[in-house]
């Protein structure tokens, strides 16, 4: 029998980013990609969940955890999960000292916010 | 009705497929059961967690091994 590589039986963490138009949306997106690169989970499409595409919604329902990274307090990502009754853990990048429309998003900022979220996940 | 079992062939995927085939046989339905192992097709359907089950192109479950009874209730819907 071929070795299983489908991920069955492993903990599945799905990561969603707001990816909005502001600097904070860009930061949320970059942090999500960084977390995926670090092996925290698999990034998938928040917009597809919002559009209620069946595969994305079923995956969110079947995942061990859904990590939603919102860009600001408007909380569109969390709003989508609330509306659909899906379980999630929310992080908002402006909670980490980033100002919407003001802070320049550098590699250093991305790394700092990513590590802070990673720490919260590990300690949560 | 077309029922797709999405998974790459591990034991949980195979269990779901067996439960689906048993449910279809018991229901007397003329549903066609298809095993999908192609990762690109799973991605196209937005499936990020396996095993998953799609009915007529709509994903109804992911990350769970549904029982025969659960599949039967889906078939009857």
Kindly give the residue locations of the regions a language model identified.
Chain B
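Short loop/edge segments at beta-strand edges and connector loops
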Residues: 35-37
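C-terminal structural segments of small proteins and small subunits
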Residues: 30, 42-77
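Local sequence-structure signature of Cys/Sec-based thiol-disulfide redox active-site neighborhoods
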Residues: 1-19
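Conserved helix-turn-beta segment immediately C-terminal to the redox Cys motif
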Residues: 19-33
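Short, solvent-exposed coil/turn elements at secondary-structure transition points
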Residues: 9, 39-41
